[in-house]
């Protein structure tokens, strides 16, 4: 994917929502399956944090097409994943600041907070 500027390691919920609406991004949920069952952002692909290394090729392929917006509950695990992905050469990824919790408060209040 060609991008004129270097993508930041983190992205605000509003900016993420804009990229998703434009079809330029895909959501990657790195929480555990039981958390995904509690609440999720529509269209997100569940890849628990522990499974990310085994699914690196899948993530690399997705990042060739769109920006990966990685999220978790509050943004800690997702930032760890984004830092790891960057070290593997996956540049088109960013962690959702505040995770699904801030997304619920700023973008979509229909997403349950927990």
PLM region descriptions:
Residues 1-25, 33-67, 76-114:
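Rhodanese-like catalytic fold shared by cysteine-dependent sulfurtransferases
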Residues 71:
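Short, surface-exposed ligand- or partner-binding patches at beta-edge/loop junctions that are enriched
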């Amino acid at each position: 994917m060609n991008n004129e500027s270097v993508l930041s390691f983190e992205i605000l919920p509003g900016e993420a929502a804009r990229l998703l609406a434009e079809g330029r991004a895909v959501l990657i949920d790195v929480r555990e399956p039981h958390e995904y069952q509690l609440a999720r952002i529509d269209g997100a692909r569940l890849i628990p944090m522990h499974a990310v290394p085994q699914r690196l090729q899948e993530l690399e392929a997705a990042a060739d097409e769109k920006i990966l917006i990685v999220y978790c509950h509050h943004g800690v695990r997702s930032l760890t994943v984004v830092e790891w992905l960057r070290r593997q050469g996956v540049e088109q990824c960013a962690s959702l600041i505040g995770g699904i919790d801030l997304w619920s408060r700023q973008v979509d209040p229909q997403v349950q907070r927990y």
